Amino acid sequence: MAARNRSNPLALAVLICLAERPMHPYEVATTLRQRQKHESVRLNYGSLYGVVESLERRGLIAAQETRREGRLPERTVYRLTDTGRIEVHDWLTELISTPVRDYPAFEAALSFLPALPPDQVVTLLHERAQRLEVELAQAAATRELAQKAGLPRVIWVEHEFDAVLREAELGYVRTLIRDIESGGLDGLQWWREIHDTADDEPGSLPLPTRDARPDERKE
């Protein structure tokens, strides 16, 4: 049985393309781009060929034929194996049913928010909010085009999910901006004071922790 290695969504995308029909890697990439799947799965040709080689080693796909079209280099066409078909079902079932702990870069930045002065953070959050607004407007335009083209919702549901996440993020960013600007954010005074201290004592800026409340860490 093929060893399980389900860390790369691009591998799943390749398997699902081959579940439709045998393809060569370039055709897989073209299909994914035509269907806008590269917006949900990180795609570049270098990594794609590495993924294809890995899937073949694991017995999930197999070379069906090698062919040449005109002056183009030879291309190997791959097909999905029976083991690969089972893997598609099991992998997709796992992804849909089981939440996985991701580590978003913005969440990491929030965890170290006090390392920057509050006023600078507010400026940066305003910039982020503006970018999110632009992205949401673009996403709405894309959805409108899809609807006008008569594409069923199930075809672009991942874009809908992405928009919901971005709307939630934008709402949170706006709330955080408001709480900082109004002075209502718990710990804001401590946050300002550590930067005042850092100006006088270089190297004195502490890493934020959850061991104590801000007023306890000042002592």
Predicted regions and their residues:
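Amphipathic alpha-helical dimerization/coiled-coil segments
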Residues: H89-A137
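Alpha-helical transition-metal enzyme core signature, strongest for iron centers
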Residues: P25-V28, L55, L132, A163-V173
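Basic helix-turn-helix/winged-helix DNA-binding cores
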Residues: M1-R101
